[in-house]
Amino acid sequence: MTDIPTLGVEEEFLLVHPGSGAPVALNREVAARAADMDVELQLELTSCQVETATAVVDDTAHLREQLLHLRRTASAAAEHAGARLLAVGLPPTLPHEFPVTDTPRYRDIGERYGMIAHEQGICGCHVHVAVPDRDAAIAVSNRLRPWLPLLLALTANSAIYRNADTGHASWRSVLWARWPSAGPPPHFDSADEYDAAVQMLSHTGVIRDDGMVYWDVRPSANFPTVEVRVADVPATVDETVLFAALVRGCVMTALEDERHGDPVLPLAPYALKAAYWKAARNGVDGDGVDLENHVPAPVSDLLGYLTERTRPALEAAGDHELVTAGLARVTDLGNGATRQRRAWRRNHDVDDVLAEAAAATLEDG
């Protein structure tokens, strides 16, 4: 295993009122200020969100530097516009509204999908890993399917929503699943079969365009990469780096397995759905589903198994120590959802959750 693929990361953030914590429609103002600071922010579907994107990097050290710089710049731009930047999967407090961003494409999506679009103030994280071609991206997608619930559990960061504990570590993933092309990707035998499926969804009007293929793994339409989209936006930079490193390890392992002709684990749809539900419900604080044996197992054990399964790739990329230390920290202290609940349970005061999320967003080590 000698080829170490490059990677890049996109993070979505929520803009909230610094006092009430309610989402605010200021993405254009924040993006304009960030542009003055030489950082390009993308506008998302709702006008209370912005997205950052790193450059293509070779290693996780440079990735971390970029992520921290982008979060700090976006936060400063938000503050200048009268908002606060939060790395949360969902707004912890009641939104005043989720107005759709005023572009032709987003207006059309708002009209087509109604409340699904207008309740879309949710934030995820997308990792792009370089692959040889689109057929390789599809092969990787097929092989990543059993690991997606674990990656969701690891990054869960949306336990508190509308001033209440949702009972789920990732309520974002539950809301996200309402889109017709969201969730785990189907198994495809080739890129041609994938393209035929996308064409069918588009031709029947189920999706507006190829950009609305929201499966949790997909070949990028714009880059020679496979894109893994299963995560809530992690609470901290270090958790994002951990997620990205583990995703790259999974992609490298999948490519190696494909080269060797190793069989793909067959997955019944009900089993994968069950594992997703457990991941969204429990995050890292409880059981997940062992999809090889169809039995419950502690998420910490399943993450340990995944680390060993991907160890050759992680070591080749120089990320094994980072991943093992990061997983130990998350297992011991919890992830974003754990932090949200810990803050909420102190006084059942959403201000505590907002303060915790704001601190985590810019946490450095």
Swiss-Prot record:
Its EC number is 6.3.2.2. Pfam families: GCS2. InterPro entries: GCL_type2/YbdK_subfam (IPR050141), GCS2 (IPR006336), Gln_synth/guanido_kin_cat_dom (IPR014746), YbdK (IPR011793). The keyword ATP-binding applies. It catalyses: L-cysteine + L-glutamate + ATP = gamma-L-glutamyl-L-cysteine + ADP + phosphate + H(+). One of its GO terms (biological process) is modified amino acid biosynthetic process. GO terms for molecular function: ATP binding; glutamate-cysteine ligase activity. It comes from the Bacteria. Keywords: ATP-binding, Ligase, Nucleotide-binding. PANTHER family: GLUTAMATE--CYSTEINE LIGASE 2-RELATED. HAMAP family: Glu_cys_ligase_2. NCBIfam families: gshA_cyan_rel, PRK13517.1-1. Belongs to the glutamate--cysteine ligase type 2 family. YbdK subfamily. ATP-dependent carboxylate-amine ligase which exhibits weak glutamate--cysteine ligase activity. This is Putative glutamate--cysteine ligase 2-2. It comes from Mycolicibacterium vanbaalenii (strain DSM 7251 / JCM 13017 / BCRC 16820 / KCTC 9966 / NRRL B-24157 / PYR-1). The lineage of its organism: Bacteria, Bacillati, Actinomycetota, Actinomycetes, Mycobacteriales.
